[in-house]
Amino acid sequence: MAEEVVLMKGNEAIAHAAIRIGVDGYFGYPITPQSEILETLAEEKPWETTGMVVLQAESEVAAINMVYGGAASGKMVMTSSSSPGVSLKQEGISYIAGAELPCLIVNVMRGGPGLGTIQPSQADYFQTVKGGGHGDYRLIALAPASVQEMADFVGIAFDLAFKYRNPAIILADGVIGQMMEKVVLPEPVSYTHLRAHETSLHL
C-alpha cells in the first residue's frame, strides 16, 4: 500500500500519531502554543474508533495526576502542555518517576520565564534534562527537528518509557508545533506488547 502523505502542523501530527499507535488516554489542558493537540484529538473523536479517552482537565495539575492514575493501571497515557503548564505538572511528574511508571509528556515550549511568550524557544532544555521536579530522577527526552519527527517520536517515546519504566517527554520548539510540513503518519497499530514489560519492583 502506498504511503499516505499529508500536510499538517506539528501539534496535529502528535495527535494523529497518538491515535494511530493506540494510546489509551490523553489528559490535557489548553495552553498556546500546544492547544492544537487537544483540539485535534477532540475533532477526531478517537473514543468512537479506538476507545481512546480524551479529557480536558480542570487544570494542569489535575491532568498530570490523571496521567499518574492511568499509568498506574497499566494504560498508555499522555499529556501535553507548554512551559508554565509543565512547571505546574512537576510534582506529578516526580511522583510518576518515583513509582517507575511509563507515560508521555509533550512540551511545546514557550520562551522566557513566568508566563513567557509564544515565540519559538528551547528555553526548557535544562529543566527537562535535569528531571524537572524534586528528587534524583531524569526524564527520557526526545527533541524533534521536524514535523515528521513529531509524529515519529510518539511511538518511540512510548517504547522507551515502557522499556525503562520512566516518563518520557517530547521537547518541541514552539515553531515546530505550529509550522506545516508533509508527514507520513505511522501505520495504525496497537502497542499492546508494551504492557508485557516487567512492572515496577516497588508496586
What are these regions (language model features)?
Residues 1-131, 138:
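Thiamine diphosphate
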Residues 203:
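Cytosolic catalytic cores of cyclic-nucleotide second-messenger enzymes
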Residues 120-174:
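Conserved thiamine diphosphate
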Residues 192-199:
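Conserved small/polar residues in nucleotide/adenosyl-binding loops
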Residues 110, 172-179:
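Glycine-rich beta-alpha junction loops
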Residues 42-44, 94-97, 155-160, 185-188:
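Short, solvent-exposed amphipathic alpha-helical segments in soluble enzyme
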Residues 176-178, 182-190:
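Rossmann-like dinucleotide-binding core of oxidoreductases
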